[in-house]
Curated annotation (Swiss-Prot):
Protein name: Cytoplasmic tRNA 2-thiolation protein 2
Pathway assigned in UniProt: tRNA modification; 5-methoxycarbonylmethyl-2-thiouridine-tRNA biosynthesis
Coiled coil: none
Modified residues (Phosphoserine): 489
Originating organism: Saccharomyces cerevisiae (strain AWRI1631)
Function noted in UniProt: Plays a central role in 2-thiolation of mcm(5)S(2)U at tRNA wobble positions of tRNA(Lys), tRNA(Glu) and tRNA(Gln). May act by forming a heterodimer with NCS6 that ligates sulfur from thiocarboxylated URM1 onto the uridine of tRNAs at wobble position. Prior mcm(5) tRNA modification by the elongator complex is required for 2-thiolation. May also be involved in protein urmylation.
Keyword match Chaperone: no
Superkingdom of source: Eukaryota
GO biological process, one term: tRNA wobble uridine modification
Compartments (UniProt record): Cytoplasm
Amino acid sequence: MECQRCPASARNPATVESRKEKFCDECFIKFVSTKQRKQMMKDEYFRNLFKVIYPFEKEGSVSKILLPLSLSDSGSLVMLDIVHDLLLEQTKQHNNRTGFTVDVLTVFTEENVSVIKERMESLINEKMSQLNKISNIFNVHFIDVNEFFNNASEVSTFIIDNENFEIFSKSKSVDDSNILTLKEILGKYCLNNSSRSDLISIIKTQLIKHFAYENGYNAIMWGHSMTKLSEVIISLVVKGKGSQIATFLDSESFDTLNNKPCKYKNLYPMKDLLSVEIESFLQIRNLAQFLINVEETNVKPNCLIARKSLPSLGQQKLVKNMTINEITNKYFQDIQNDYSNIISTVSRTADKLTQPKSSMAKPSQCQICQSKIYTNPSNWLNRITVTSPYPVETTEEKYLFKQWQDSKLGQSHTHYVELLNEIKQGASNSLDVEDGDVKLCYGCLILLNTSIKDKNLVWPKVDTMDITANATNNNKELSQILDQFEINSDGEE
């Protein structure tokens, strides 16, 4: 088989087959890179961010771009590789000048800090040091996921009244004796893997957006492929957060954080690429060596002709043990080679969605996920749900009720009622219609009601958070990492 994009007089052997077209390695790399660069030049705002602007002395001629890098995600790594090549081209064409600088941000946990340290050393030496010998183009930042809790001066305890779905909250100050951790939140409050996955995703996204807001970036480049975006879109619908889709995909408006306007826009440069194409690019460019889950990455589906691979049966989870995100991921991974049109249909349809009309008296944002709230979820649930139990009457019913009270489930309910009454005493009802202060969106309300122990959750107050400009300085070990791998204009380590 021959590449269909090479000149007819010198066709190379085909190594990749995607979208019913055959590519050699060189043509496929160009195909993927062109798709990403096209999105980076999608409108005037982004064109001005990424192109070299003359004169160089003009204020704002060099843009600041934040690139969240997950070393367990192929998309963000491939995106960084293509951005690196673009910057290298600009330095050659414009006398060592570039139109933008890139700050790479990695959010880590205690469990993976050592392997991230090792992989980042290799990545910095191979992909960033060369350009930083010319100019200070790349900067690297690390944030401990627990900074989400450490940097809040206040936390709120949210609880749902299961009789009418009203939400009550109680705030308290944070000091060194009662700082929360991710491990504590996931272990103490979450009842299943789906709720753990949701909270981790919310925390990481908020850390990245706070970092961008506080450090004045012009754009955040997310490494979501078309497949990944479709997974997120369907997951949002399933979780009751479909109203967030339009905002999530919005690359035309400046973002908002805690009802405050931001100076950056969100960009998805990989949105025209399937995840199998990204995995194939990763293998061709030998980038898997930088990921912390190399073995898992090597068995992911791709569109390489000679090296197609599928997960073995031993690696597959039972559906009942999978999170919502994992179920949607499995579905789209299974169909993308043969039915990629389904994925593109989901993505294109979502792009056409607009934000719902709000029925709120004033703009409100969810205190957990920071999404916009368009209607009062508690009122709607109260209208369609019967929560009053049937009264206990017969001797048998009284006996069974007593057994239930003595069970773990009954004791848990008793603890929930006591906690609800305690919070109610000093808390104002969040559903005051005139005040319009609705604290949770529908999706987070359902999460709290069904997947969180005792229907209550302690969460940092976003308006009291302060993710510092140099987050790594808050952690001694990672400060040492940055010192060791510091990349500067002289190219010295």
